[in-house]
């Protein structure tokens, strides 16, 4: 079973630092560092976390990223909701069975996270990721 559970909300926009400061102050969030892979995604991001471990990723909006990288789904344009799962292959199989297009990014932006992006019927971007051992 893949056991999807909410993990983070990704907010993309132009005023990244200002937006991060707003959410940090408004929701009493703590800044955290993620182990980044700059070759996969080099933009500066702000990552905040609440007391329960739910994260907020504030990133620059990049609507052309998917086209430049030949992807059907843009993982960094417009923001997304993310679910952590135990079995990314089960999610991939379910999306295939439902005929849903997706971008399987593998481990590309955050070390140890295999990320896959799809859209819901309204076009909202959804991320599923599994923590994997890279060792």
Segments from the language model and where they lie:
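Active-site beta-strand termini and strand-to-loop segments that position acidic
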Residues: 46-52, 118-121, 131
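N-terminal beta-strand motif that seeds the catalytic metal site of vicinal oxygen chelate
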Residues: 1-20, 78-83, 132-135
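Vicinal oxygen chelate
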Residues: 14-17, 74-125
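A short, acidic/glycine-rich surface segment
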Residues: 32-34, 42, 64-69, 104
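Short beta->alpha transition motifs characteristic of CBS
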Residues: 33, 128-135
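Short, charged/polar surface micro-motifs in flexible loops or helix N-caps
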Residues: 51-55, 62-65, 88-89
